[in-house]
Amino acid sequence: MMFATKIKMKPGCHNSHSLLEIDEIYITGCATPGYYKKDIVHDHVKENPGSIQVNVWPYPDVVHAVSVNREKYVRSSPNAYGHDNLLSLPRE
């Protein structure tokens, strides 16, 4: 199983609470752990649903999404408070 363990936001957006501002996601449990651009992660989970989970309880799946401006991004199931667990990961 692969896990998203931390995120990098776009320059100037370190404190953003927008999934669209995520630039890269650190993935572990794969042959080459490291940071991957969000569009690469988007394509992977689109082709392989359920293959990456957020490393925050309750470990929701990372799923693909497309913004109204046709920008590829990823998200997870919101937690009980309506907050996406992907945004709870440590930031660099």
Predicted features by range, described:
Residues 14, 22, 83-84:
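Intrinsic-disorder/low-complexity regions
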Residues 2-14:
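Short, extreme N-terminal segment that most often corresponds to the first beta-strand
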Residues 1-2, 92:
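Absolute protein N-terminus
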Residues 6-8, 26, 53:
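Ser/Thr- (and often Asn-) enriched beta-sheet segments in non-cytosolic proteins
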Residues 28, 32-65, 71:
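Eukaryote-biased intrinsically disordered, low-complexity acidic regions enriched in Ser/Thr/Pro
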Residues 54-92:
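Short, compact, well-ordered microdomains
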Residues 2, 20, 72:
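A broad, low-specificity signal marking well-ordered, structured residues that form hydrophobic/aromatic
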Residues 18-26:
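Long, compositionally biased charged/polar stretches
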